[in-house]
Amino acid sequence: MSQFFEAATPVAIPTNNTNGGSSDAGSAATGGAPVVGTTAQPTINHRLLLSLKEAAKIIGTKGSTISRIRAANSVKIGISEKVPGCSDRILSCAGNVINVANAIGDIVDVLNKRNPENEDAAEGEAEEHYYFHFLNHILPAPSKDEIRDLQQLEDIGYVRLIVANSHISSIIGKAGATIKSLINKHGVKIVASKDFLPASDERIIEIQGFPGSITNVLIEISEIILSDVDVRFSTERSYFPHLKKSSGEPTSPSTSSNTRIELKIPELYVGAIIGRGMNRIKNLKTFTKTNIVVERKDDDDKDENFRKFIITSKFPKNVKLAESMLLKNLNTEIEKRENYKRKLEAAEGDATVVTERSDSASFLEEKEEPQKNHDNKEEQS
């Protein structure tokens, strides 16, 4: 029996949205409105692989479409620069988990919409075969047997979510249990690419379904990624849009054509610099357009109190910017902890003074009591 695509049922989330998330964000989710964002949600940064045409559609005339999505969902959203000879671009969307999921639901809805004045071009675009095979859909197009309302067939869309390989196994689950649960619960189709994106440790998770259903499944995927504590933040390389199809082995992020800087960060501050779920370091890499590798610690490592950060890029100014921002983050964290330590010491000092005063008062009371007894005896005599 064929699986039916299902309309999304909004997750019950409090609506005290002080982040500026708008209910308009859910208007795109045909087949069910996405949930409304809240300030209690942790943050995440999702990256999507786009073709050039998809990127142009999301940007819109003079950036109007992407600006609307950004404002409606209170997220940071951007698309990598268009490079001559490159067939793909990367969309990054950062913010709290629910707002990011809502924004991506809006993106799916934008990609689903066809220009009624140019139906032939839209049909050709849907059937386009890309030379860069990661842009070609892994999942087959939805059939009429997989949907209850044929009028909603065109509302089913896709996203190509870029995910670090270390998270893929958690999303799939033991014997595929987790991914099967997501598919059945949200009425979507999900598949992971077998191949790694060029020169990276990332793969594609393709999701097919209604925009609202994709929104809700992304919330659960985000929670899986954020709770995936057994991740080695390490040497995983992020994918950046290729210039040409690789003819051999993936190129190393530290080739001779790249500018390279190594920094030693105290082990005590590494977790804070990387951020929860590697969000902080990922945002830094995206903003500076660099590759940053955090080396794993070896048992025989002599510098056991430090971790090596390696920054590489083809552009020296980008490497310098990343180095400057990384050191600034380190100094901010050091200062933050020093301030906390001083406040803690001051509070302990105040507590000591109070204790000493209390002890002194008790001593004086004890000293005065015998004196009173002595005076009473003299009066009686």
From Swiss-Prot:
The gene is HEK2. It comes from Saccharomyces cerevisiae (strain JAY291). It is found in: Cytoplasm; Cytoplasm, P-body; Nucleus; Chromosome, Telomere. GO terms for biological process: chromatin organization; mRNA transport; regulation of translation. It holds the Pfam family KH_1. It comes from the Eukaryota. GO terms for cellular component: chromosome, telomeric region; nucleus; P-body. One of its GO terms (molecular function) is RNA binding. Binds RNA. This is Heterogeneous nuclear rnp K-like protein 2. Residues 369-381 have a biased composition (Basic and acidic residues).
